[in-house]
Amino acid sequence: MRGKTLLAPSLLSADLMNMQSSILSLEGEHDWLHVDVMDGGFVPNITFGPGFVGALRGAFPDEVLDVHLMIEQPSRMVDAFITAGADYLTVHAEADHHVHRTLSRIRENERKAGVSINPGTSEEIIRPLLPFVDMVLVMSVNPGFGGQTFIGTMMEKVTALARWRAALGLSFLIEIDGGVGRQNAAMAARGGCDVLVMGSAVFGTPDPASTLREIRNIVEEADERA
Ligand code: DX5
Ligand code: ZN
């Protein structure tokens, strides 16, 4: 049986001038904090670095920090994010020539290793890596910005990954990122997503905590039926 669906608000859509109060506005209704790291090369945007992750870790020692690296050659930077205090560290398969080595490095440091694929990348690419990951992040928009529209066909990747996971006896989590919100959370949970990343759908609402409570009810109902 699946575990309960986890909710991971993305700080990309938080109030950058008031990060601490944005996080507190979640009132603990979330499971993880998702941190989008962008380098202006792999994606056409620049966001947070290890210093930000370290500051988060210092201010919120008990939070699960889910760090999504949308950067070229992530192997050069994983040590810095490990030191900063990331719990989950996810690298893009498209950005690294030696993803297995990078994933191993993350795990050697007792952090959870994730691999991600863009909408245009087949899940077949990461099939050989599945025994070496704690999470697969399926991008359901082209990474770079919040507030984009969910690409529904990406759920086919989730189905394939869940099937392979069962066949191989593995236990990695499947995370979906981009365009997720109240309108499709039940479908995503029922379709096999274990972690829902949500930026604008949470921080773009007047009361993020009550939005999360609503989405929690929606996914719990879906979990019961799954
Ligand atoms: C997109 C990022 C996402 C983003 C999602 O490149 O990886 O995590 O914050 O934002 P929404 O939920 O608004 O699509
Ligand atoms: Zn992300």
Task: Report the location of each language-model feature.
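C-terminal helical cap(s) of enzyme catalytic domains, especially alpha/beta-barrels
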Residues: 106, 189, 204-226
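Glycine-rich, proline-tolerant flexible connector loops at the mouths of alpha/beta enzymes
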Residues: 34-50, 141-149, 206
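Conserved anion-binding
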Residues: 3, 15-18, 76-80, 86-173
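Hydrophobic faces of well-ordered beta-strands that scaffold small-molecule active sites
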Residues: 5-10, 33-35, 56, 65-69, ...
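Catalytic cores of alpha/beta
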Residues: 21-26, 75-83, 121-133, 178-196
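A short alpha/beta connector and helix-capping loop motif
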Residues: 43-74, 185-202
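N-terminal amphipathic alpha-helix/helix-capping segment at the start of soluble metabolic enzymes
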Residues: 1-13, 20-21, 223-226
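Short helix-capping segments at alpha-helix termini
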Residues: 59-63, 108-110, 165-171, 220-226
